[in-house]
């Protein structure tokens, strides 16, 4: 639990390393939430097709490169044996999660939601460690609570405020594999919302209450509380398709860039290790540039190759939706499949460094 609160920026004008992407993440979500709040008052509505286009722009063009960057940055300066095990574990995770969708799509969707919560939550807590400290989170259960609340905003809040759209897209996602399984989403949705909203609300109150009581006056609690409430407001006010599509590039990725800028990972370098990515650190600029290009190409081919395999194996790749809506559903499934090992292997099992490394 790193404590850098003494270097903490103010809420809007940080001074620590990584201050620019941190500020961008906050102002972006604040501006979007405010814009949609004003828009609703003026009777403005965004067509679903436009929302889908924004989602694809955010998740494919803006956010996908950062996911690859996280892995390559984590694997740089690591031994070849570790890199090999990492890649194998990653591919096994992808295969297992992909198989779950074909066998039990509803369970797969449930796990996908859990992965999104975990990625946003635990990745967020790690960025807090590096950027403004977490001295108000004094125990491991309290850190988990913070992660669930922050990550829960990504999925739970849209379920509460954008219920119809959330369930409609969930139905399309399930229909990619088995349209008959959609019936499992039926039932008393109003009661589910009540239970889900009550439970999440209690967790938010507990998180903020404990943080307030254990705050040490360094500013970390105030920053955490403000960001938590901002996330909740953002996902409540911004249409869910746009909200999710822009959250990952504008918030998650931006804050991980800020974390990377704020920490020094040179101490974790295995000086005597020889790995598959050593050429990236070559003294010869031409060789380093060529290696970077090769990594980009290999990563792109591998990613879209996996997407192509999923597309070809899926009984109904667009889930019965239109082109844009179907692509949003398909890409959401694909991203969740590759995100599972991203979180489990890259974030949790790699205890030496990991994609969210903070010394």
Curated annotation (Swiss-Prot):
Principal localisation: membrane
Q: Which cofactor does it need?
A: Fe(2+)
Q: Where are the transmembrane segments?
A: 27-47, 48-68, 87-107, 108-128, 154-174, 194-216, 229-249, 293-313, 320-340
Q: Does the keyword Cell membrane apply?
A: yes
Please provide, alphabetically and separated by semicolons, the GO molecular function terms listed in this UniProt record.
beta-carotene 15,15'-dioxygenase activity; carotenoid dioxygenase activity; iron ion binding
* GO CC entries: plasma membrane
- What are its GO biological-process terms? carotene catabolic process; retinal metabolic process
Question: What EC class does the entry list?
Answer: oxidoreductase
This enzyme's EC code(s): 1.13.11.63
Report membrane topology.
Multi-pass membrane protein
Tell whether Iron is among the UniProt keywords.
yes
Q: Which InterPro entries match?
A: Blh_diox (IPR022270)
Kindly list the places in or outside the cell where this protein is found, as annotated in its UniProt entry. Answer: Cell membrane
Q: What happens when the gene is disrupted?
A: Cells lacking brp gene display a 4-fold decrease in bacteriorhodopsin levels compared with wild-type, whereas bacterioopsin levels are normal. Moreover, the beta-carotene level is increased by 3.8-fold, whereas that of retinal is decreased by 3.7-fold. Deletion of both brp and blh completely abolishes bacteriorhodopsin and retinal production, again without affecting bacterioopsin accumulation, and the level of beta-carotene is increased by 5.3-fold.
Could you tell me what reaction this enzyme catalyses?
all-trans-beta-carotene + O2 = 2 all-trans-retinal
Keyword line: Cell membrane, Dioxygenase, Iron, Membrane, Metal-binding, Oxidoreductase, Transmembrane, Transmembrane helix
Q: Which NCBIfam families match?
A: blh_monoox
Family according to the record: Belongs to the Brp/Blh beta-carotene diooxygenase family.
What this chain does, per the entry, is described as: Is required for retinal production and bacteriorhodopsin biogenesis. Probably catalyzes the cleavage of beta-carotene at its central double bond (15,15') to yield two molecules of all-trans-retinal.
Would you tell me the protein name for this molecule?
Probable beta-carotene 15,15'-dioxygenase Brp
Q: What is the scientific name of the source organism?
A: Halobacterium salinarum (strain ATCC 700922 / JCM 11081 / NRC-1)
Provide the gene name from the record: brp
């Amino acid at each position: 639990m790193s404590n850098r609160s003494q270097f903490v920026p103010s809420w809007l004008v940080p001074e620590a390393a990584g201050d620019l992407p941190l500020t961008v993440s906050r102002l972006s979500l604040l501006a979007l939430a405010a814009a949609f709040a004003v828009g609703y008052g003026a009777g403005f509505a965004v067509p679903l097709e436009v929302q889908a286009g924004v989602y694809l722009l955010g998740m494919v063009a803006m956010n996908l490169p950062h996911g690859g960057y996280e892995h390559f940055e984590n694997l740089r300066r690591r031994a070849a044996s570790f890199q090999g095990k990492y890649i194998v574990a990653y591919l096994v995770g992808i295969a297992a999660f992909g198989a779950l969708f074909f066998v039990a799509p509803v369970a797969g969707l449930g796990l996908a939601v859990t992965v999104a919560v975990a990625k946003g939550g635990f990745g967020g807590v790690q960025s807090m460690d590096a950027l403004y400290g977490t001295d108000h989170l004094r125990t491991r259960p309290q850190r988990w609570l913070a992660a669930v609340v922050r990550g829960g905003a990504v999925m739970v809040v849209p379920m509460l405020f954008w219920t119809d759209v959330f369930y409609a897209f969930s139905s399309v996602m399930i229909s990619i594999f088995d349209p008959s399984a959609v019936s499992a989403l039926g039932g008393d949705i109003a009661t589910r919302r009540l239970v889900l909203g009550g439970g999440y609300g209690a967790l938010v109150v507990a998180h903020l209450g404990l943080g307030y009581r254990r705050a040490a006056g360094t500013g970390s609690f105030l920053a955490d509380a403000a960001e938590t409430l901002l996330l909740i407001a953002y996902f409540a006010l911004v249409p869910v398709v746009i909200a999710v599509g822009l959250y990952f590039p504008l918030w998650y990725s931006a804050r991980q860039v800020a974390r990377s800028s704020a920490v020094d990972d040179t101490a974790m370098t295995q000086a005597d290790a020889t790995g598959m990515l050593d050429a990236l650190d070559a003294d010869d600029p031409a060789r380093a540039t060529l290696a970077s290009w090769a990594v980009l190409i290999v990563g792109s081919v591998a990613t879209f190759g996996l997407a192509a395999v999923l597309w070809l194996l899926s009984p109904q790749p667009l889930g019965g939706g239109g082109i844009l809506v179907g692509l949003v559903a398909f890409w959401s499934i694909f991203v969740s499949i590759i995100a599972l090992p991203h979180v489990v292997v890259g974030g949790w099992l790699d205890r030496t460094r990991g994609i969210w490394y903070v010394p």
